[in-house]
């Protein structure tokens, strides 16, 4: 039984799917019903994602594997950990969330990733790459220590296997001989041809069977008295299997390698998993799947359909007919190409985010200076440091949330040696539908405390371009942060202008009398809503531009000429840009009340970006409300008077 193409007409009845409220219902089905169920599930995923937006290609590729896992294993007693987690829509649908899929990634809706608080079937929260094997191994060992008999399963993609953490976990897991651990490599890199046919089914069943495992162990025990013979037997086995599968690497880690098998063929998946269920020790199953499976348009262009917005499945994704504002990612991509054209020392680095970071054109035009290092953020940062020692100008394009993974390298390998590496930090601040796992909430706080760092926050597209240019001129590590999505509509200026280091600018001045004068010190994306709030309150607004070094002279000048100071940033308040202003104020010796606004000390959920900003009080109305309540209301006057009298 193998996946079929979806014939989309929007009228699928889902007769089988609507009977599945949890995996126990699935396990009551006859095996012959599973492929029709898979067809319905795939159609449901397509229909659902087309209405909400979300990850599509990866989910179309995991339908049969998801069904097989829940059919064979006793979930949730048996644990499944999904690496990255954006391929879990079929899993969510089969585990009681079918009727909530309309709210996927929406404000107050279900998450696009596994979430422990959402379902007992989401055994471990994931969204960043390459964590699944470590988590599943911890579960397997924990179950052993607790005396529980359960399997722990990690499902990891071929891309995630490039990260060092995955191999660290496998190195640890390989010595856990009794652990009931299964690692499934979901290989959807189509440079590897899917193995199909009776021979591959036979090999997979053979290698996952008890006879094969017992015979292999028995032969090794018998031949262990003659080490040279044992070594010869091992080499013969590896050679024989190597003609069919790349087993040697994983078996060197102590895993029993099985596969590769067709990940869309339930007649291969189910008996193989049933055999594995009877084994002990670390097992490694290699399944080959296809992103976008069953939907021709996604099969043809899985990148385009990786994370689409809403679209008509019958027609596919159509180019927008209305001119869109340029995104900050596009601004970065254009800037990088322009700088590379001017200076042959400019080198671009991305940890597996070529499209997302806006480096497609750079790769085409400057292929010899483009480096996609895979999902390896730690390596990317240290690699950039090495390039800098040779007089090159490395630019690391990285999402804020992923820079967290290379913090030691940022400190030890770049900042400590004061190497001139530029960090173009995309997706800074809230990221909307991707939620807390991808929010760029912490970069200002965790970078600001590092010596030698310069940090800028862009308020519009042109400022972003000029900040990036300024960063490239610095003799030390420098970061420019900018948000996800479209900018403000400001045109970028082709000519470069270096921004004076550590200098902000006043964008609006108050006309209020003494006693009511408020100065808003805004950083990056918060300049626009701060200006909106200032119009309502008649306040001064400064575009601070630099988080480090913060413009201490401007902070002092505003403190001396205003009664109240307000700092606003789209990042965590603790240790962030506002804290830099407070420190500068303390250093100046000028005492003024300060209100720090930013992201709260909690993980902000997924949803529409504008709604989330409003929820956090970081839209124009929210900023004005907070200022009024703290400083300008009658209650604030009474409280302030009481403090002065005291």
From Swiss-Prot:
Keywords: Isoprene biosynthesis, Magnesium, Metal-binding, Thiamine biosynthesis, Thiamine pyrophosphate, Transferase
Cofactor(s) named in the record: Mg(2+); thiamine diphosphate
InterPro entries: Dxylulose-5-P_synthase (IPR005477), THDP-binding (IPR029061), Transketo_C/PFOR_II (IPR009014), Transketolase-like_Pyr-bd (IPR005475), Transketolase_BS (IPR020826), Transketolase_C (IPR033248), Transketolase_CS (IPR049557)
Top-rank EC class of the record's enzyme: transferase
Note accompanying the cofactor annotation: Binds 1 Mg(2+) ion per subunit.
Positions of Mg(2+) binding: 158, 188
GO BP terms, alphabetized: 1-deoxy-D-xylulose 5-phosphate biosynthetic process; isopentenyl diphosphate biosynthetic process, methylerythritol 4-phosphate pathway; terpenoid biosynthetic process; thiamine biosynthetic process
Stated name of the protein: 1-deoxy-D-xylulose-5-phosphate synthase
Source organism of the structure: Burkholderia cenocepacia (strain HI2424)
Lineage: Bacteria, Pseudomonadati, Pseudomonadota, Betaproteobacteria, Burkholderiales
């Amino acid at each position: 039984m193998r996946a079929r193409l979806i014939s989309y007409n929007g009228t699928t009845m889902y007769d089988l799917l609507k009977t599945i409220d949890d995996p126990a219902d699935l396990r009551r089905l006859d095996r012959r019903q599973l492929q029709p169920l898979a067809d319905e599930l795939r159609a449901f995923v397509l229909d659902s994602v087309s209405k909400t937006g979300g990850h599509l290609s990866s989910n179309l590729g995991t339908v049969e594997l998801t069904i097989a896992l829940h059919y064979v294993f006793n979930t949730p007693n048996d644990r499944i950990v999904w690496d990255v987690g954006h391929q879990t829509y079929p899993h969510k649908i089969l585990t009681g969330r079918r009727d909530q899929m309309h709210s996927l990634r929406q404000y107050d809706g279900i998450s696009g990733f596994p979430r422990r608080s959402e379902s007992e079937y989401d055994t471990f929260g994931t969204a960043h790459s390459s964590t699944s094997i470590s988590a599943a191994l911890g579960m397997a060992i924990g179950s052993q220590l607790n005396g529980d008999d359960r399997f722990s399963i990690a499902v990891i993609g071929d891309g995630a296997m490039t990260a060092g953490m995955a191999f660290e976990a496998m190195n640890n897991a390989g010595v856990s001989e009794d652990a009931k651990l299964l690692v499934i490599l979901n290989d959807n890199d189509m440079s590897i041809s899917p193995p199909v046919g009776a021979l591959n089914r036979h090999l997979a069943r053979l290698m996952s069977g008890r006879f094969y495992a017992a015979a292999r162990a028995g032969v090794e025990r018998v031949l262990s008295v003659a080490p040279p013979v044992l070594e010869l037997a091992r080499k013969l086995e590896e050679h024989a299997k190597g003609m069919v599968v790349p087993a040697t690497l994983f078996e060197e880690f102590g895993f029993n390698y099985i596969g590769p098998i067709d990940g869309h063929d339930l007649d291969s998946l189910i008996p193989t998993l049933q055999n594995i269920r009877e084994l002990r020790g670390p097992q490694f199953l290699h399944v080959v799947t296809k992103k976008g499976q069953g939907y021709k348009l996604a099969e043809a262009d899985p990148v385009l359909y990786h994370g689409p917005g809403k679209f008509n499945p019958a027609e596919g994704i159509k180019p927008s007919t209305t001119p869109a504002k340029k995104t900050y990612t596009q601004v970065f991509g254009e800037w990088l190409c322009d700088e590379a054209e001017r200076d042959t020392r400019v080198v671009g680095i991305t940890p597996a985010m070529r499209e997302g970071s806006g480096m497609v054109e750079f790769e085409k035009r400057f292929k010899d200076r483009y480096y996609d290092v895979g999902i390896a953020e730690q390596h990317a940062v240290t690699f950039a440091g090495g390039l800098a020692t040779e007089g090159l100008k490395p630019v690391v394009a990285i999402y804020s949330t992923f820079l967290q993974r290379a913090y030691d390298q940022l400190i030890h390998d770049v900042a400590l040696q004061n190497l001139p590496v530029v960090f173009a930090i995309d997706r800074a601040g809230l990221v909307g539908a991707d939620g807390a796992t991808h929010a760029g909430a912490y970069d200002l706080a965790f970078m600001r405390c590092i010596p030698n760092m310069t940090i800028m926050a862009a308020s519009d597209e042109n400022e972003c371009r000029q900040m990036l240019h300024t960063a490239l001129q610095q003799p030390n590590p420098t970061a420019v942060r900018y948000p996800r999505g479209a900018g403000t509509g400001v045109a970028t200026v082709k000519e470069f202008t270096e921004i004076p280091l550590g200098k902000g600018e006043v964008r609006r001045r108050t006309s209020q009398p003494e006693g009511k004068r408020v100065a808003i010190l805004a950083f990056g994306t918060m300049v626009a809503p701060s200006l909106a709030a200032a119009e309502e309150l008649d306040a001064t607004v400064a575009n601070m531009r630099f988080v480090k070094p913060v413009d201490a002279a401007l902070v002092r000048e505003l403190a001396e000429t205003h009664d109240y100071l307000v700092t606003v940033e789209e990042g965590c308040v603790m240790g962030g840009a506002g804290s830099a202003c407070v420190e500068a104020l303390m250093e100046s010796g000028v005492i003024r009340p300060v209100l720090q606004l930013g992201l709260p000390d909690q993980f902000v959920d997924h949803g529409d970006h504008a709604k989330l900003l409003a929820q956090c009080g970081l839209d124009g109305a929210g900023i004005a409300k907070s200022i009024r309540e703290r400083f300008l209301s009658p209650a604030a006057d009474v409280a302030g008077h009481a403090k002065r009298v005291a």
